[in-house]
């Protein structure tokens, strides 16, 4: 029997890719809604009542209002996966980054309220948590995270901005150091203070790279690039969607020596590169992913699969 799914916000950037993925999933059936009724609450409540799972791909405030109405009508029995940032640090919601730690998949399976991570947060936490969990860096460390994302991460307005005419190769934003992903990075990174987060948007549609540069001076004594790489290798060795390149590998670079943020488009994978200069005592960790894949709709499908006992990779990849 197919799992009945309703996507609220299926016409948005994340919603469209989520729908594309779910159409390829052999275990689900999508509940449709007429375009002229998609903002009609009473009509949506009828669709919610039919659904085993509700995906929310809405702006934050709309998501909060919709969850309120679902709770009022159905209590906590309906399974919700929220792709917005509205509930990412709320009590009663489980954080939908399955690779966060060894217990996270169980937490996702055992709840009816799953909040999908932000795309930047996914990359940042994949780099930070192994270091914190193994006491390599202190929870009070001042971290500096740099990142670049394709412009689809900014939704329809940014897509229109970059699509209409030639634009700069990339642009910095969130210059007041208040990006909305910071709270979840700090909370789930187990950090005592916000990192300095410097995001930018590139003149390409999809793909992203999140990087964490560190000095060995900030770490416990006797650390080296090889030891850090071994920690990451052990942490992610059983994770299907996280790959780790060999230490200081040139194979992940283009022939010109560049590291492209666009290698995983259409997938739910996250790739980690570690570059270490033990002589200078510096290390650079870089996570790459598709901002609309592992950073959004792919992760949402993965969380659905975990929740309902399907194979974890079913429907997570878009066909080219």
Model-inferred region functions:
Residues 237, 261-320:
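C-terminal helical cap and adjacent loop that interface with cofactors, partners, or active-site loops
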Residues 123, 220, 224, 295-296:
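Secondary-structure boundary/capping motif
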Residues 11-45, 57, 141-147, 151-285:
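C-terminal substrate-binding/catalytic lobe of Rossmann-fold NAD(P)-dependent oxidoreductases
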Residues 2-167, 173-174, 275-278, 314, ...:
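N-terminal Rossmann-like NAD(P) cofactor-binding subdomain of oxidoreductases
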Residues 90-95, 103, 168, 196-199, ...:
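Residue-level signal for pocket-adjacent positions within structured domains
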Residues 19, 68, 125-132, 182-186, ...:
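Predominant activation on well-ordered alpha-helical scaffold segments within soluble catalytic domains
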């Amino acid at each position: 029997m197919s799992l009945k799914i309703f996507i609220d916000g299926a016409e948005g950037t994340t919603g469209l890719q989520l729908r594309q993925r779910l159409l390829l999933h052999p275990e689900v059936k999508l509940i449709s809604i007429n375009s002229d009724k998609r903002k009609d609450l009473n009509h949506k409540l009828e669709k919610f009542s039919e659904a085993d799972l509700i995906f929310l791909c809405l702006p934050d405030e709309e998501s909060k209002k919709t969850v309120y109405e679902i709770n009022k009508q159905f209590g906590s029995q309906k399974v919700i996966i929220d792709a917005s940032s509205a509930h990412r640090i709320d009590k009663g919601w489980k954080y939908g980054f399955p690779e966060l730690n060894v217990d996270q998949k169980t937490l996702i399976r055992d709840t009816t309220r799953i909040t999908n991570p932000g795309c930047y947060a996914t990359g940042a936490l994949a780099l930070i948590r192994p270091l914190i969990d193994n006491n390599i860096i202190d929870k009070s460390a001042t971290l500096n995270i740099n990142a670049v994302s394709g412009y689809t991460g900014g939704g329809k307005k940014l897509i229109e901005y970059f699509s209409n005419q030639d634009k700069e190769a990339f642009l910095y934003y969130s210059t007041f150091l208040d990006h909305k992903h910071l709270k979840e990075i700090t909370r789930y990174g187990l950090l005592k203070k916000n990192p300095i987060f410097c995001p930018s948007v590139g003149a390409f549609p999809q793909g992203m790279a999140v990087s964490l540069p560190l000095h060995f001076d900030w770490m416990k004594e006797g650390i080296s690039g090889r030891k850090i790489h071994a920690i990451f290798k052990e942490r992610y060795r059983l994770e299907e969607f996280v790959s780790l390149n060999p230490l200081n590998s040139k194979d992940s670079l283009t022939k010109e020596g560049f590291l492209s943020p666009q290698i995983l488009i259409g997938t739910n994978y996250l790739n980690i590169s570690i570059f270490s200069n033990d002589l200078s005592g510096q290390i650079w960790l870089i996570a790459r992913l598709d901002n609309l894949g592992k950073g959004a709709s792919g992760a949402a499908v993965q969380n659905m699969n975990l929740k309902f006992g399907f194979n974890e990779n079913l429907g997570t990849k878009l066909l080219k």
